[in-house]
UniProtKB/Swiss-Prot annotation:
Organism: Vibrio vulnificus (strain YJ016)
InterPro entries for this protein: ADP-Glc_PPase, ADP_Glu_pyroP_CS, GlgC_bac, GlmU/GlgC-like_hexapep, NTP_transferase_dom, Nucleotide-diphossugar_trans, Trimer_LpxA-like_sf
Protein's name according to its UniProt entry: Glucose-1-phosphate adenylyltransferase 2
Binding partners and assembly: Homotetramer.
GO molecular function: ATP binding; glucose-1-phosphate adenylyltransferase activity
C-alpha cells in the first residue's frame, strides 16, 4: 500500500451535534466509553496497511490534535510512514476551507509531494469497520478514475446522502446529492444505493478535477455536489459495495453517520445489544485509541450498605461505583457514582461525578461535570429544557464543565 496517500477530512463544525461539539471537533467527540469518533477511521487505515495519512483539521482542533499526538504517534517516519495533522495553511489565500473538495485543493502541494499514484479520501466522523485493501484492488483492476464505496439503505434515510445509480458492472451512471425523492434500486422500491463518503481517486484525475473545480465560481467545492457528477461523464467511476466477504473484517455491515445527537446516542446504544451490530471484539481488528492509565473499574459497598451494580453496560477504567446502579448505559473513564444514584439508558463521559441519590435517564453527560446529590435529569422535560439541550427523541445533553 505504498502507492496510496490517505486524506481524512476532519474539519467540519458538526453543529448538529452541539453542545458536544461546542469546544471540540466532531471527530474528537468521545464514543463507546473509551474511543473518539475518528479512531474507527484511523483503525481501518492501520489494519488496511495505509501508512501515509493526512488529517485535515480546521474547527476547534486542539482536542483532536492532542488525541492524534497521544494515541496515534505509532508510525515510523524512517519507513515513509506518518499520520500528520494539517490545519489550514492559507496557501491559496486567506480563507477557511469552503467545502470538502476545497479542503484538499488547498493542500494539493502535499498530494504532489507524496508521489502517490492513488488518493483515498475518508471522513473522520463515521462509525464503521472496513478493510480498504480490496477496494483499492478493485479500483486498480477497473482502471478507474474514481471508486466510491456504497451501501443500500431505506429510501427515507437516503435523503441525507448522495444517491447513486450503477450498471451490472458497478459502473456509476448517475449521482445526486441529498435528493428529496431518492431513486430506488431497480429490484427493490424501498431501498436506495448511497455513497458512504469513502473515495479512491487516481492521483492525476483528482488533481485535475480539483483545479478545474477551484476555477468554477459557481461551484460549492463539494465532492458529492460537484466533483463526482462531473467525473461520471468520463465513464470511469465505479461503485464498491460495502458489506461483503472481501477483506479481513468480520461481516457486520455496520456504518453510521453520527451527525446528530439522536444518531450519536443510538450508535452508542447499539453497542449494548446482546449481539452488537458492530463487532468491537474481533481480535485481529482491535480499535486503537489513547486511554489514560487508570486502574480497573470497581464496585464497592456504600456507607449505607448498598452494593454498586452494573447491568448490561460498558464500563471503562478508573470507574468507582459506590452503591449506585447503572443499567443499559456507557460509562467512560474516571467516573464516580455515589450511593443510591441510578443511571439508566445514558452515556457518561470522562471525569464526571454523580452525586448521592441522583436519577439520570436518557441523557448524555459531557466531561468534567459534578452532578449534585439528588439531581434528576431526564425525568421532567420542562425542567430539563430550561437548562439543557433536548434532542428530538428526548435525549438530554449536559454540556462539558457545566456548573449546577
Amino acid at each position: 500500500m505504498q502507492d496510496i496517500l490517505t486524506v481524512i477530512l476532519a474539519g467540519g463544525m458538526g453543529s448538529r451535534l452541539s453542545p458536544l461539539t461546542d469546544d471540540r471537533a466532531k471527530p474528537a467527540v468521545p464514543f463507546g466509553g473509551k474511543y473518539r469518533i475518528i479512531d474507527f477511521t484511523l483503525t481501518n487505515c492501520l489494519h488496511s496497511g495505509l501508512r501515509k495519512i493526512l488529517v485535515l483539521t480546521q474547527y476547534k482542533s486542539h482536542s483532536l490534535q492532542k488525541h492524534l499526538r497521544d494515541g496515534w504517534s505509532i508510525f515510523n517516519p524512517e519507513l515513509g510512514e506518518y499520520i500528520t495533522s494539517v490545519p489550514p495553511q492559507m496557501r491559496k489565500g486567506g480563507k477557511w476551507y469552503e467545502g470538502t473538495a476545497d479542503a484538499i485543493y488547498h493542500n494539493l502541494w502535499l498530494l504532489e509531494r507524496s508521489e502517490a499514484k492513488y488518493v483515498m479520501v475518508l471522513s473522520g466522523d463515521h462509525i464503521y469497520r472496513m478493510d480498504y485493501a480490496p477496494m483499492l484492488e478493485e479500483h486498480i483492476a477497473n482502471n478507474a478514475a474514481l471508486t466510491v464505496a456504497c451501501m443500500d439503505v431505506n429510501c427515507k434515510e437516503a435523503k441525507a446522502f448522495g444517491v447513486m445509480g450503477i450498471d451490472e458492472h458497478h459502473r456509476v451512471h448517475s449521482f445526486v446529492e441529498k435528493p428529496q425523492n431518492p431513486p430506488h434500486l431497480p429490484n427493490d422500491p424501498e431501498r436506495s444505493l448511497v455513497s458512504m463518503g469513502i473515495y479512491i481517486f487516481s492521483m492525476e484525475v483528482l488533481q485535475q478535477a480539483l483545479i478545474e473545480d477551484a476555477d468554477n465560481d459557481a461551484s460549492s467545492h463539494d465532492f458529492g455536489k460537484d466533483i463526482i457528477p462531473k467525473l461520471i461523464d468520463t465513464g470511469s467511476v465505479f461503485a464498491y459495495k460495502f458489506c461483503g466477504s472481501k477483506g479481513r473484517v468480520d461481516k457486520d455491515c455496520y456504518w453510521r453517520d453520527v451527525g446528530t445527537i439522536d444518531s450519536f446516542y443510538q450508535a452508542n446504544m447499539d453497542l449494548l445489544e446482546p449481539i452488537p451490530p458492530m463487532n468491537l471484539y474481533q481480535k485481529d481488528w482491535g480499535i486503537r485509541t489513547y486511554e489514560p492509565q487508570y486502574p480497573p473499574a470497581r464496585t464497592v459497598s456504600s456507607g449505607s450498605g448498598n452494593e454498586g451494580i452494573f447491568i448490561n453496560s460498558m464500563i471503562s477504567n478508573g470507574v468507582i461505583n459506590s452503591g449506585g446502579s447503572v443499567q443499559h448505559s456507557i460509562v467512560s473513564s474516571n467516573v464516580r457514582i455515589n450511593d443510591s444514584a441510578t443511571i439508566v439508558d445514558s452515556i457518561i463521559f470522562d471525569d464526571v461525578e454523580i452525586g448521592e441519590g441522583c436519577q439520570l435517564v436518557n441523557c448524555i453527560i459531557d466531561k468534567h461535570v459534578k452532578v449534585p446529590p439528588y439531581t434528576q435529569i431526564g425525568l421532567n422535560r420542562l425542567e430539563d429544557a430550561q437548562r439543557f439541550k433536548i434532542s428530538e427523541n428526548g435525549i438530554v445533553v449536559v454540556p462539558e464543565s457545566y456548573q449546577f
